[in-house]
From Swiss-Prot:
EC number(s) stated in the UniProt entry for this protein: 3.4.19.12
UniProt xrefs under PROSITE patterns: OTU
SUPFAM superfamilies given in the database record: Cysteine proteinases
Organism ancestry: Eukaryota, Viridiplantae, Streptophyta, Embryophyta, Tracheophyta
Species for this entry: Arabidopsis thaliana (Mouse-ear cress)
Name by which UniProt lists this protein: OVARIAN TUMOR DOMAIN-containing deubiquitinating enzyme 4
Active site: 176, 179 (nucleophile), 299
């Protein structure tokens, strides 16, 4: 089975997930599988069944636009020095109750493209499965109560050079297609010193944030069109739909619309806690970002880490 990288891709069931980390940023994931749930590309924000490859180009030109509306400005800023790269492979298959017993992974081609060069990885995987009775992850189709808070607490530590967060609370977000925008809007309110929004207010804020993010795509078309998969106008039109999932481009845009940093976390069973996998908008500060938890199958929840907080900059709301 030959699998090519596709930018930030997830699949809800029977999935093989390959993650490529550049430094502390999760830069690419590929998922492939078949079930009643579609494979989903976070970079495109659209539901698709199969992926055969991808291309990435990186702009070194920072640009900014300011808006006097509810949310702030957007600034593209990419590092020019490529950080250390790491390849991870994980397997998700709860209904089939399968686990991976053997993996042979061979790098076939690796070549880079950053606006002038091309980035791609082709990986050959030989996968042998054996049965197990344990489920790999929770069902993404569940619809959580926005006030459903789950608290986890223990001492912090490090794993493979990354900090592991073990004292945290997960704020359940409904899986209605708005979960990314709901999670960011929820975190925005808390970071701004406001009360946690109720379900109705959370939905309204999420839809407003989605609209502003889509508007920024249009306003900054020359700088954003390169990382939108497929037709740009179609992509923007579809991302305005309140039930279409958002992903990495929307998180990237949201950080600049809000002028606040956003950090994405995932659970790491080997580490025994949460680790950060992506960071956006760090030019607005690195302390106390908006935090969201990504579950690896297309769903986001709001996240609180219980640690001493640094001073919080003024909101642009």
């Amino acid at each position: 089975m030959m699998i090519c990288y596709s930018p930030i891709t997830t699949c809800s069931r029977n999935a093989i997930s390959i993650k490529r980390h550049l430094g502390s940023r999760l830069y690419g994931v590929v998922a492939h599988g078949s079930s009643k749930f579609s494979c989903y590309s976070l970079l495109s924000g659209l539901s698709r069944r199969h992926y055969t490859g991808f291309r990435v180009s990186v702009s070194n030109r920072p640009s900014s636009w300011h808006d006097k509306g509810l949310f702030g400005s957007v600034l593209i800023n990419r590092p020019t020095v490529a950080p250390k790269e790491k390849l991870e492979v994980s397997f998700l298959s709860p209904e089939a109750n399968m686990k991976c017993s053997k993996i042979e992974s061979n790098m076939r081609n690796l070549y880079c493209y950053s606006r002038f060069a091309y980035t791609g990885v082709i990986v050959s995987l030989l996968v042998c499965y054996s049965s197990t009775s344990q489920s790999a992850y929770a069902d993404s189709s569940r619809d959580k109560d926005a006030n459903n808070v789950h608290h986890h607490s223990s001492d912090g530590k490090f794993h493979n050079g990354k900090r592991v967060y073990t004292d945290y609370s997960i704020i359940g977000i409904p899986g209605d297609g708005r979960c990314l925008f709901r999670s960011v809007a929820h975190g925005f309110c808390l970071r701004s010193g406001k009360l946690a929004p109720g379900e109705k207010m959370q939905r309204e804020l999420a839809d407003e944030l989605r609209t502003r993010v889509a508007d920024e795509f249009i306003q900054r078309r020359q700088e954003t069109e390169w990382f939108v998969e497929g037709d740009f106008d179609t992509y923007v039109r579809q991302i305005r739909d309140p039930h279409v999932w958002g992903g990495e481009p929307e998180l990237f845009m949201a950080s600049h619309v809000l002028q606040m940093p956003i950090t994405v976390y995932m659970k790491d069973d080997k580490a025994g806690g949460l680790i950060s996998i992506a960071e956006y908008g760090q030019e607005y500060g690195k302390d106390d970002p908006i935090r969201v938890l990504y579950h690896g199958f297309g769903h986001y929840d709001a996240l609180l880490l219980h640690e001493s907080k640094a001073s919080i900059p003024k909101s642009k709301l």
